[in-house]
Every structure is written in C-alpha cells, then in structure tokens.
Amino acid sequence: MIMTNTEAVAGHKIIKNLGLVKGNTIRAKHIGKDIMASLRSIVGGEIEEYTQMLDEARNEALKRMEADAKEKGANAIICVRFSTSAVMQNASEVMAYGTAVIVE
C-alpha cells in the first residue's frame, strides 16, 4: 500500500477516488510508567515513555487506516494526516486519516 502526505503519487496516475479512510487507537501507560513520566516532567527533558506510547499509537492507527483502505479496494492513500487528542487523564487518541485511491 502506497501512503503519502501529498495530493498525488509520484510516477502514478490516480484513476479513482474511494473517499476518506481512517484508523485510530487510544493508548494509556500503566501507573508505574506514568509516575516515572511525571517525575521526568519536573526535571525536564524528553518523556520517553510517552514518546514510545505515541509512536506505537501512530503505527497502529496507520495499520488500521490501511486495513480500511484495502477493504474499499484501494492500492494507495494520499493526503495522510495525523490527529492527536487527550480523551481522558493519561490517555491519548491518535487518528490517521487520508483519501483512499486507486493508482496505476
């Protein structure tokens, strides 16, 4: 599956637009990791526990978006974007979305 954040796929012609596709996940760290992250936020620096959590969430959201596109018969996704939001304390949602297309 070709995925790009641009409106076209270099070297390919879009022959059909299949519409919006998306994938999302909500992730939270367990209490031990959350305590460590809180302590690290006091002294400054990267909060590696959350960096890892969001990286895993983005990858899962991409997989789910790709599955949605395959279900619609697409072989590419253009205009890929991410959205992140806090849905509750210590939990974040990551959504990947884009436009499913067929390219040749």
UniProtKB/Swiss-Prot annotation:
Task: Spell out the InterPro entries in the cross-references.
Answer: UPF0145_dom_sf (IPR035439), UPF0145_YbjQ-like (IPR002765)
List the Gene3D superfamilies hit by this protein, alphabetically. Answer: Hypothetical protein apc22750. Chain B
| Pfam families per the UniProt record, alphabetical | YbjQ_1
Q: State the family named in the UniProt similarity comment for this chain.
A: Belongs to the UPF0145 family.
Q: Which HAMAP family does the UniProt record give?
A: UPF0145
Q: What is this protein called?
A: UPF0145 protein DehaBAV1_1363
Give the originating organism: Dehalococcoides mccartyi (strain ATCC BAA-2100 / JCM 16839 / KCTC 5957 / BAV1)
